[in-house]
Regions:
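Active-site proximal beta-strand in glycosyltransferases
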Residues: 2-4, 103-121, 149-151, 173
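N-terminal strand-loop element at the rim of the active site
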Residues: 6-67, 160, 172-174
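A short, histidine- and acid-enriched strand-loop-helix "catalytic/donor-clamping" loop
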Residues: 8-14, 59-63, 108-129, 140-142, ...
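Membrane-proximal helix-turn-helix segments that form the acceptor-binding/catalytic region
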Residues: 22-27, 73-76, 129-151
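An amphipathic, basic-hydrophobic alpha-helix
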Residues: 57-86, 96, 100, 104, ...
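Short His-centered aromatic/hydrophobic patch
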Residues: 89-95, 114
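A short, active-site helix/loop in glycosyltransferases that binds the activated sugar's phosphate group
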Residues: 144-172, 180-182
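Conserved donor-binding/catalytic core segment of Leloir-type glycosyltransferases
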Residues: 177-179, 189-204
Length: 204
């Protein structure tokens, strides 16, 4: 069985999805990672874990149609070459372009992760409004297929996608986050006395 995990940036994969890839590898999958070309140290880390890396020219903020078409062609070529059984797309562009490429190739199980809708859906102004409408249209055209399964991390996003007729409700599930490796982050005893709490997060 072959699995491809597709993300914008390799550092994001290493910080958020590496344990999933290792679990799939240990379960017997041949695991491939596709992302924007990164540092040699990050690629070496994948090699040590016996994960195969494939550079894809993702540009997170690009709106250049030729560049975006090039990215789509690269994904389509990669899927034809590897013939994966499952593709797992994470973040907006991998979800949209990866799903489209996988549907063109044929019988591939498609699992998309929508961890949040991001800043675009709360930003004000006419530019943000237009971009949001275009993104929702793209989601509806590309994701509205019985071949596609979607993971959400909160019910509000699932409801929004359902209201805009983007998804098949029976092809979705809600998970409570990307997960924490408890072998690496071990539970510590609660200190006595008055504690201090630090939140390290991006507030939207």
């Amino acid at each position: 069985m072959k699995l491809i995990i597709v993300v914008n940036e390799l550092w994001f994969f290493l910080s958020h999805r590496l344990p999933i890839a290792l679990a799939a590898r240990d379960a017997g999958y041949e695991v491939h990672i596709a992302a924007h070309l990164s540092t040699s140290a990050e690629i070496e880390q994948l090699n040590r874990e016996h994960l195969q890396f494939h550079p894809i020219s993702f540009h997170r903020s690009s709106l250049n149609p030729w560049q975006e078409f090039k990215t789509l062609k690269e994904l389509n070529k990669l899927y034809k070459q590897i013939q994966p059984d499952i593709v797992h797309h994470v973040t907006i562009k991998p979800v949209l372009y990866g799903t489209l490429a996988a549907r063109w190739v044929g019988d591939i199980k498609i699992l998309n992760a929508i961890s949040g809708l991001g800043y675009l859906f709360i930003a004000q102004g006419w530019k943000s409004f237009i971009r949001k409408k275009i993104l929702l249209w793209g989601y509806r055209v590309i994701l509205n297929s019985k071949k596609v399964w979607i993971l959400f991390q909160n019910p509000d996003d699932q409801i929004l996608f359902s209201q805009h007729k983007i998804i098949y409700p029976k092809h979705t599930a809600i998970i409570k986050g990307s997960g924490v490796d408890l072998n690496q982050f071990i539970t510590s005893p609660i200190p006595k006395g008055k504690g201090k709490i630090i939140l390290v997060a991006r507030m939207l």
